[in-house]
Design a protein with these regions (language model features):
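Acyltransferase
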Residues: 1-150
């Protein structure tokens, strides 16, 4: 992680994933969606200036925004140059079959043992959108009322 480029930003915006996705092309690949936390809370990630420009647009339209206190623009192209090294490190770990069900933040669905014990899965997790809202929706649909979130 230390070799990932600095200078990025992550900002939570009171907007749907679709609303945010519709505005991303105007930023020419400098931004991506880091996380979909709720139906109306989406986190953007990428270049600092582009992220703040987009957040200002949403704020000027009456939406709440909050910059996240992070060291890097995770889940964005800023991570691309460390993915190979991350995979190399992840491949040295010993993985075990989970003893409790785990919902994947990549899919919002139950993760398989094959996924959770594969270094490539964790590389994807570093780079792609966190589908937290989809996971909560899946749990709710299956009448789960108690959750444990594990993260950094």
């Amino acid at each position: 992680m230390q070799t990932a480029p600095t200078g990025g930003a992550m900002i939570a915006i009171e907007a749907t994933e679709t609303e945010i996705r519709d505005t991303l092309p105007t930023h020419h690949g400098h931004l991506d969606i880091a996380a979909v936390n709720t139906p109306h809370s989406t986190v953007i990630t990428g270049d600092h200036d582009a992220a703040h420009q987009l957040a200002t647009t949403w704020r000027n339209n009456g939406r709440r925004t909050k910059q996240l206190n992070v060291s890097h623009a995770f889940h964005s192209p800023h991570m691309d140059n460390i993915l190979n090294d991350f995979h190399t490190t992840a491949a040295t770990l010993t993985y075990h079959t989970p003893t409790i069900p785990i919902i994947s933040n990549l899919t919002g669905q139950p993760a398989t043992t094959e996924q959770l014990t594969n270094p490539h899965y964790w590389v994807q997790h570093l780079r792609h959108t966190v589908r937290f809202n989809d996971g909560i929706h899946h749990l709710h649909h299956h009448n789960v009322t108690t959750y444990i979130e594990l993260g950094p």
